[in-house]
């Protein structure tokens, strides 16, 4: 049997008109981990807090620059969230997330929002200043970095989901007895202290702890699509309406 560890972007393939695949084409063994996004500026930036940066964006609409790795990606989605919240930034696309980060370190752009898995070393070296976790909660590994919603509470409806999520899935044709074995094996791994320490050391968000049964897993993915697919469509990024695929807006 072929197993797949997939990224969250599969939930947008249809609305982005990339291909006719979605979460419902697969059986989810478990969400794995989220890789939290952190809003950072360069070490020499004049901005020392999220509020200072947001004030500058308000005072200079469309002038403060934000780098990302391309339309439809998690970093770009966060730029769309800022837009929805009334913060107009100049979004600049780079070839990769790492290039987007180096653009900030090199002073080419004002800020970006990389994953913590690629950012930790730059925080430790002092090359960047982390202003906020792009989430509604702080990270255990970096408890001094405030959550974005501590400064902008109204962002909570967009930030109660992981923006970079890995999931463990199999084809829908996989026999149920095989799915059951894989789920049991996954639960055994998740309970292993070695795995728990690995997740902690990498500052990952243990999403698997929150969603264990099929109903909660389905609700999780439905909510993710409601947030992201409509966010992209309303901002002209997605080609097709989420309504075509039965994706409801938040709160519907």
Language model segments and positions:
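Mobile beta-alpha loop/short-helix "lid" or hinge segments that flank ligand
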Residues: 29-30, 154-162, 196-207
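Short secondary-structure boundary segments
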Residues: 8, 43, 116-117, 135, ...
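Short, Asp-centered acidic motifs that coordinate Mg2+ and/or phosphate
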Residues: 2-4, 38, 110-111, 130
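Short beta-strand segments
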Residues: 4-7, 240
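C-terminal lobe and pocket-closing loops
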Residues: 120-190, 239-244, 248-252
């Amino acid at each position: 049997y072929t197993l797949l560890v997939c990224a969250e972007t599969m939930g947008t393939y249809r609305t982005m008109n990339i291909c006719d695949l979605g979460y419902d084409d697969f059986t989810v063994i478990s969400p794995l981990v989220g890789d939290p996004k952190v809003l950072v500026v360069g070490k020499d930036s004049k901005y020392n807090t999220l509020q200072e940066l947001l004030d500058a964006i308000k005072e200079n609409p469309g002038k403060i620059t934000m780098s990302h790795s391309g339309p439809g990606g998690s970093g770009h989605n966060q730029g769309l969230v800022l837009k929805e919240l009334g913060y107009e930034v100049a979004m600049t696309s780079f070839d990769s997330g790492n290039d987007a980060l180096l653009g900030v370190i090199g002073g080419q752009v004002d800020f970006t929002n990389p994953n913590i898995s690629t950012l930790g070393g730059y925080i430790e070296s002092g090359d960047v200043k982390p202003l906020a976790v792009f989430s509604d909660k702080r990270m255990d590994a970096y408890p001094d970095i405030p959550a974005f919603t501590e400064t902008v509470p109204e962002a909570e409806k967009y930030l109660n989901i992981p923006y970079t999520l890995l999931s463990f899935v199999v084809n829908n044709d996989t026999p149920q007895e095989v799915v059951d074995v894989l789920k049991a094996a996954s639960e055994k791994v998740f309970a292993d202290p070695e795995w728990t320490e690995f997740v902690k050391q990498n500052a990952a968000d243990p999403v698997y702890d929150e969603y264990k049964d099929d109903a909660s897993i389905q609700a999780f993915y439905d909510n993710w699509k409601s947030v992201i697919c409509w966010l992209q469509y309303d901002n002209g990024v997605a080609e097709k309406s989420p309504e075509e695929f039965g994706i409801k807006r938040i709160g519907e």
